[in-house]
Amino acid sequence: MKPLKLNYFFIGIITLLLALALWPSIPWRSSQDVQLRQILSRGELRISTVNSPLTYAMSNGSPTGLDYELAKRFADYLGVKLVVSSRKNLDELFDDLDGDDADLLAAGLIYNHERLERFRAGPTYYSISQQMVYRLGSPRPKTLDKLQGRLVVTSGSAHAATLRDLKAEKYPQLSWESASDQSTQELLKQVADGKLDYTLGDSVTIGLMQRIHPQLAVAFDLSDEEPVIWYMRRSHDDSLSAALLDFFSQLVEDGTLARLEEKYLGHVGEFDYVDTTTFLSAIDETLPDLRPLFEKYATDIDWKLLAAISYQESHWNPLATSPTGVRGLMMLTRNTAESLNVTDRVDPEQSIRGGAQYMSHMMQKMPDTIPEDEKIWFALASYNMGYAHLLDARKLTEKQKGNPDSWVDVKMRLPMLSQKRYYTQTTYGYARGHEAYNYVENIRRYMVSLEGYLIEKEAKVQQQTQIALGYPAVPLTKVPE
């Protein structure tokens, strides 16, 4: 999969031009601001979305997701309460707009020119490419006229619109089926399971799905980079659109959009089939015995993150030993173990307890100016290459006009610490910054795989239990976008 492209300059320019075009004619706080006035009078911003870790989900009792966080910030910007409705499919989403049951659709939707006849597009907040997907091991098609099997896409989606355009322009013999009751994620899973030959997906969704279904493979791209947007009702009143454009312009300018996209999309780029399949096997074979210990001692971080750190360190091998002498599930040094009262580094419980305590200590060392949800990445980089070198990376970031408290800015400077023209300017000199960069990114990818795999596995168990008891099976929980 090619790396995700987040063109903030392009997004900022387009957003600014649109805002300037709208602002002189209809200021969003004028007497004509009907849509916005209704939201302010109601005291609520109503959004409809779909349930997935990328858009909106509950994690440890709190809502999370890129679209949720953006919507919450927009509601705060307007000074109103956010009300979220989760829907099953595209038809239900757009029905909410038609029926005035939602002000915005915030669901990671691709720009679809067919929808613009009835709905208005909001600003771009990241971009994707549409891709043809097949199952690894099957013949790889090179073009649309080389497909040999069933192609199914979600009805009403941008993928269906793309196929209609391509059929009219170049491939008159092209045929496919549309599924109104299945999401893109569900169709991708069918391809991974060998139940379907082909489907279309966006590069981000595919990249995340490959973390739990490594059998998914990209045959070719069907589009260049396309915008992901929110939708609102089309009307002569531009007040809500103008407010949204102004809001996103501020997010681009102050770096908030870049930080949120790093949080949810920054780990999507690279995919290693062998490493992923090995990790998924370890989840089934090794993790069940260790999970109670991770859950017991992960007091300051998610237990799945602690498990991902341990896998990166030792591949969950309690007897792991490195040439430098670090040992155990968390690969503790002798000095670190002694400071944490760990008497036996190869004892699983002692190692996990010590590792959790050490990570908590490292996070506490991070400056308060760093956002809470980013401190863990700084702490992990510090753990890998040393706190002093992390200080150098932050100073280098600031010197280059970046934000030393933003992980998206600092992580790009880590590899520079091994380049002479940069490390000669630092206080503590040369560091294997590229290793720290890869270390953190690997842990983030393991975390995504673990979360998605467990969600899907637990949903299957629930469904099988219901069938065994004679109850109708509920639909499986959607896997990560």
From Swiss-Prot:
Naturally occurring in which organism (per UniProt): Pectobacterium atrosepticum (strain SCRI 1043 / ATCC BAA-672) (Erwinia carotovora subsp. atroseptica)
Alphabetized PROSITE patterns for the sequence: TRANSGLYCOSYLASE
GO CC entries: cell outer membrane
Domain notes: The N-terminal domain does not have lytic activity and probably modulates enzymatic activity. The C-terminal domain is the catalytic active domain.
Region (LT domain) residue spans: 269-481
Keywords of the record: Cell outer membrane, Cell wall biogenesis/degradation, Lyase, Membrane, Signal
Pfam families: SBP_bac_3 (PF00497), SLT (PF01464)
Protein name: Membrane-bound lytic murein transglycosylase F
Similarity field: In the N-terminal section; belongs to the bacterial solute-binding protein 3 family.
Enzyme Commission number(s): 4.2.2.n1
One GO molecular-function entry: peptidoglycan lytic transglycosylase activity
Catalytic activity: Exolytic cleavage of the (1->4)-beta-glycosidic linkage between N-acetylmuramic acid (MurNAc) and N-acetylglucosamine (GlcNAc) residues in peptidoglycan, from either the reducing or the non-reducing ends of the peptidoglycan chains, with concomitant formation of a 1,6-anhydrobond in the MurNAc residue
Keyword Membrane appears in the UniProt entry: yes
Known function: Murein-degrading enzyme that degrades murein glycan strands and insoluble, high-molecular weight murein sacculi, with the concomitant formation of a 1,6-anhydromuramoyl product. Lytic transglycosylases (LTs) play an integral role in the metabolism of the peptidoglycan (PG) sacculus. Their lytic action creates space within the PG sacculus to allow for its expansion as well as for the insertion of various structures such as secretion systems and flagella.
Active-site residues, record numbering mapped to chain: 313
Region entry Non-LT domain, spans: 22-268
Cell location: Cell outer membrane
Membrane topology qualifier: Peripheral membrane protein
Residues annotated as signal peptide: 1-21
GO biological process, any: cell wall macromolecule catabolic process
Gene3D superfamilies: 1.10.530.10, Periplasmic binding protein-like II
